[in-house]
């Protein structure tokens, strides 16, 4: 897809370029001054003086300096937008004449600075009289007259700068994203977690089951991988004595694009010594409930046709029980036991009976997870912890004491999608060694997402990892819930896009 420029738009661009040439010839700083002191924001002015009468403002003689982008022209009034909101500027007849002579007039999209007295219009709108003014940046390309006219979603994502200029909902979504990240960070610090940074390039990819991006380090002449997860490095820090650590950063997975997936995405991953997966679930409830109330004023948030209640307590049920709950009419599923789940032929037949396409290398645990994803996952609208993940799909998680087929692991679902993954960490070095070897066998059998063997991590475990619990929370998916958006591209400023034709 190539950017389409209509003939009328070409004409407008040419006219604006001609204006810029005039400005360069007649104005200082080559038409791009950098000496305007913006002292006030639109929203602050509106909040402070929005309730004053016209007469009160006249008597106060308030001077304000504003700067921003012209979003509309209404006779002598210009609507100026800055990061906080909008306010008007008024150009009297003499000012209009000067604007015409100096700049050949102002256009929508131009960035200007204005200083003058604050007034109230006859319609009750605050405005700054243009007593002093500068054209700070001449916009050469016109904005869409109405954002409704920019209906191509790809254009919104490829030209996010235009999207942010003209779409208030988009701006608010990314403001909320920033607030969510800050609130999570503050929560973790208050809980005495230390924020750390671990490598983004790994010599051995690990910490998750995913296909990595590969690159080459020229000086060392070795293959390097963009990290798929920081887990193994963070647990090395717990071995080293940092008992509570967290990291908010990017992960990279060489996989497909979808409303829930982007090749690079943001995770908050944390580890706490002397805790188990039950402690993680409790902490997650406390975190999300407090953040929702802090940022939105209520733990109950709208999401599509639903209302998601972050207030807690959150439902907790095993993967097997969830499959049974959401397949009430399937007699085979209703009578299914863990002994049958361990029978790979039984699980394959069950998956096929559900119309699923299966891979030859799928284990019993993978089949159970796929059946869960096919029949139950999308039903989990309210916050729900799904426990009882099989050990063969949880190579870094501690086995359950009562049922060694499963682990002390959960995934956290809201709005029908996974938002977090956590577990009691496997700190048995010999068991971890065996599970890494099983992952190597799976990779040899065709599973591209199976983990690599990491000998140094085994060495770290042999020094002793205390009982530890760790969790990763998908920031992008969480922000989707807080902003009531349904594609991950709406909460990532510059999402991955297919090349334009």
Curated annotation (Swiss-Prot):
Cofactor mode of binding and number, as noted: Binds 3 Mg(2+) ions per subunit.
Top EC class, one word: ligase
Any one GO CC term of the record: cytosol
CDD domains given in the database record: LysRS_core (cd00775), LysRS_N (cd04322)
Cofactor dependency: Mg(2+)
Binding site for Mg(2+) 1: 411, 418
SUPFAM superfamilies: Class II aaRS and biotin synthetases, Nucleic acid-binding proteins
GO molecular function terms listed in the Swiss-Prot or TrEMBL record: ATP binding; lysine-tRNA ligase activity; magnesium ion binding; tRNA binding
GO BP field: lysyl-tRNA aminoacylation
PANTHER family, per database record: LYSINE--TRNA LIGASE, CHLOROPLASTIC_MITOCHONDRIAL (PTHR42918:SF15), LYSYL-TRNA SYNTHETASE (PTHR42918)
Record HAMAP family: Lys_tRNA_synth_class2
Family (UniProt): Belongs to the class-II aminoacyl-tRNA synthetase family.
Protein name as annotated: Lysine--tRNA ligase
UniProt gene name: lysS
């Amino acid at each position: 897809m190539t950017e389409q420029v209509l003939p009328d738009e070409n004409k407008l661009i040419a006219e604006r370029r001609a204006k810029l040439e005039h400005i360069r010839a007649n104005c200082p700083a080559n038409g791009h001054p950098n000496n305007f002191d913006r002292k006030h924001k639109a929203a602050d002015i509106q909040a402070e003086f929005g309730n004053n009468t016209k007469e009160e403002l006249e008597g106060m003689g308030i001077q304000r300096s504003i700067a921003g982008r012209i979003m509309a022209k209404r006779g002598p009034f210009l609507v100026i937008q800055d990061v906080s909101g909008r306010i008007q500027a008024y150009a009297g007849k003499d000012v209009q004449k000067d604007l015409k002579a100096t700049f050949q007039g102002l256009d929508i999209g131009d960035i200007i600075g204005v200083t003058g007295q604050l007034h109230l219009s006859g319609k009750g709108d605050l405005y700054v009289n243009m007593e002093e003014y500068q054209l700070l940046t001449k916009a050469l390309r016109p904005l869409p007259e109405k954002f409704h006219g920019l209906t191509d979603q790809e254009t919104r994502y490829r030209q996010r700068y235009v999207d942010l200029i003209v779409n208030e909902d988009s701006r608010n979504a990314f403001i909320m994203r920033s607030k969510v990240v800050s609130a999570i960070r503050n929560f973790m610090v208050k809980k005495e977690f230390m924020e750390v940074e671990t490598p983004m390039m790994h010599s051995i990819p690990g910490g998750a089951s995913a296909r990595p991006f590969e690159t080459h380090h020229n000086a060392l002449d070795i293959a390097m991988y963009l990290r798929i997860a920081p887990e193994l490095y963070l647990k090395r820090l717990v071995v080293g004595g940092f008992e509570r650590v967290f990291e908010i950063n990017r992960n990279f997975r060489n996989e497909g694009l979808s409303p829930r997936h982007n090749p690079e995405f943001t995770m908050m991953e944390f580890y706490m010594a002397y805790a188990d997966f039950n402690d993680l679930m409790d902490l997650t409830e406390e975190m999300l409930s407090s953040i929702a109330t802090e940022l939105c004023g209520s733990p109950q948030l709208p999401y599509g046709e639903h209302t998601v209640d972050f207030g807690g307590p959150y439902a907790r049920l095993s993967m097997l029980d969830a499959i049974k709950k959401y397949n009430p009419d399937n007699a085979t599923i209703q009578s299914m036991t863990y002994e049958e789940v361990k029978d790979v032929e039984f699980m394959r037949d069950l998956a096929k009976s559900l119309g699923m396409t299966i891979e030859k290398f799928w284990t019993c645990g993978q089949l159970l997870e796929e059946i869960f994803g096919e029949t139950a996952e999308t039903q989990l609208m309210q916050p729900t912890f799904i426990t009882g993940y099989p050990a063969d799909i949880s190579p870094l998680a501690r086995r359950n004491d009562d049922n060694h087929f499963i682990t002390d692991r959960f995934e956290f679902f809201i709005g029908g999608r996974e938002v977090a993954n956590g577990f009691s960490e496997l700190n048995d070095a010999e068991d971890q060694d065996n599970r890494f070897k099983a992952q190597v066998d799976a990779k040899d059998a065709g599973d591209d997402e199976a983990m690599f063997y990491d000998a140094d991590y085994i060495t770290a475990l042999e020094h002793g990892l205390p009982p530890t619990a760790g969790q990763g929370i998908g920031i992008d998916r969480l922000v989707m819930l807080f902003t009531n958006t349904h594609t991950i591209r709406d909460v990532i400023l510059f999402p991955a896009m297919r090349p334009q034709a």
